[in-house]
Amino acid sequence: RGTQSDGHDFIPDAVAKGASAVVCEQLPAETAHGVAYVVVPDAAGALADMAAAFYGHPSRELKLVGITGTNGKTTTATLLYDLVRALGYKAGLVSTVVYKVGERIVEATHTTPDPVRLNAMMREMADEGCEYCFMECSSHAIVQQRTRGLHFAGGIFSNITHDHLDYHKTFAEYIRAKKLFFDSLAKDAFALTNADDKNGRVMVQNTAAGIHTYSLRTMADFRCKIVEMHVDGMLLRIDGQEVWVGLVGRFNAYNLLAVYGAAVLLGLDRAEVLRAMSMLHAVSGRFEFVRAENGTTAIVDYAHTPDALENVIQTIQEIRTPTQQLIVVCGCGGDRDRTKRPEICLLY
């Protein structure tokens, strides 16, 4: 059963169109001759298991890293993809903006696609020689078991703030959804969590994976300090080494530190990782600068939560000149979490 309709209602249509087998949670009132009916306790979970098996468990042939959290998933996943490519490796990417099999672009339909499409893409990645895959794991996808049956080399937790309460109903349920991802990691995987988020430790408290932390404020396995921030980039000190990066904002310092930590945990050389980080650039639609001919500078960002928008505004305040006027235009998508809209308006 889905959130909008019951899949059992469509069994007759599927049979009429030639389905020879039906996986369901309960037998329909009328069964068709010559059609096999397999009753399972959880059809969504069964679909994920079947998809992984049908495509030969391609995730086992990749170093798959899942990124979950309210903000920063797309940037972290994309930067990891760009980083390993800069180091000479082939990789795949599954993100809100785009799916990539090596360098081939595939149109993205969801942050995390359904298990059949997901495993089909990973089979293409493995067959085309990709060694890594970096994937956003949305809370919807985790609860709906789209990531079930996948073997993750590691998972990253960015942060958790007010979002998706239209679906999860309560913040506690939203936290639980994110935590389920880390609960499912195997003991040979790593769980990299943001120690500066008050729920960072909660996320990994029941995981079997090796736990690692990153922080800008406290003791952690991976630490970072912003030395300088300018309109065209930042000077960061990571693990005692300074590196200039072409991204701006404290939130991006967290994203970059997560990228560094994950790369090291994947076995990449620290010095080579820092060198590659200096070549990274902002992700499309994430604090992206657009300069008009009249001298006006626009910054396009996906910020759609109170916390994300506040971070963007704060970063702009830090880098703009005293004479520059700040005008904020923000939209909230329809049929989604309405409770965050008043909080967003209060930021103005």
Annotated model-derived regions:
Residues S20-Q26, A191-A195, I327-C330:
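Short internal beta-strands
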Residues A46-A195, N199-T207, D239, L257, ...:
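Phosphate-binding loop of NTP-binding sites
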Residues I11, Y81, M122, K178, ...:
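Generic hydrophobic/aromatic pocket-lining and core-packing "Φ" positions
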Residues H33-P41, V106-T109, A208-T213:
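Active-site regions of enzymes building and remodeling cell-envelope glycoconjugates
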